[in-house]
Amino acid sequence: MTDPRHTVRIAVGATALGVSALGATLPACSAHSGPGSPPSAPSAPAAATVMVEGHTHTISGVVECRTSPAVRTATPSESGTQTTRVNAHDDSASVTLSLSDSTPPDVNGFGISLKIGSVDYQMPYQPVQSPTQVEATRQGKSYTLTGTGHAVIPGQTGMRELPFGVHVTCP
């Protein structure tokens, strides 16, 4: 013999599930006429690409961006009123940036490493030496930097200047 309470519970559960599914598929309705709210633009996913001396690598790891008040006594000194610090890395590359909120953004400092095959390009974190050494642009949460930096290359003595480019989109 079937327990009638068990049958009622199944029927109520199935009805609730059906109402939930129907509610999720129906568009919202309103008694007010007029256009609905415009669809929001999808935000770009966090990403970073680094280029050193013609070699390009897309970083597959996490991109972290943190904005805080600029610290004039930091080394290197931070310009603007806010500083965005960007860190992105994976097994083959890493990027560390300090960018001001100026328009266009000032680059307070940068560090880049990129391993391509047996060559390991290392630009230790360094301040920008001149206004034309590194140029940056910002569009929304995306930054593009191009310039030259002092790099150490294993197997070579001393540091040398290398061209680089970075494109990063913050989350």
UniProtKB/Swiss-Prot annotation:
Chief location category: membrane
Stated name of the protein: Putative lipoprotein LppO
Source domain of life: Bacteria
Keywords per UniProt: Cell membrane, Lipoprotein, Membrane, Palmitate, Signal
Keyword field contains Protein biosynthesis: no
Residues where lipid is bound covalently (N-palmitoyl cysteine): C29
Lipid tethering residues (S-diacylglycerol cysteine): C29
Membrane topology designation: Lipid-anchor
GO cellular component terms listed in the entry, alphabetical order: extracellular region; plasma membrane
Subcellular location: Cell membrane
Source organism of this protein record: Mycobacterium tuberculosis (strain ATCC 25618 / H37Rv)
Signal sequence interval, chain numbering: 1-28
UniProt-listed Pfam families: Myco_19_kDa
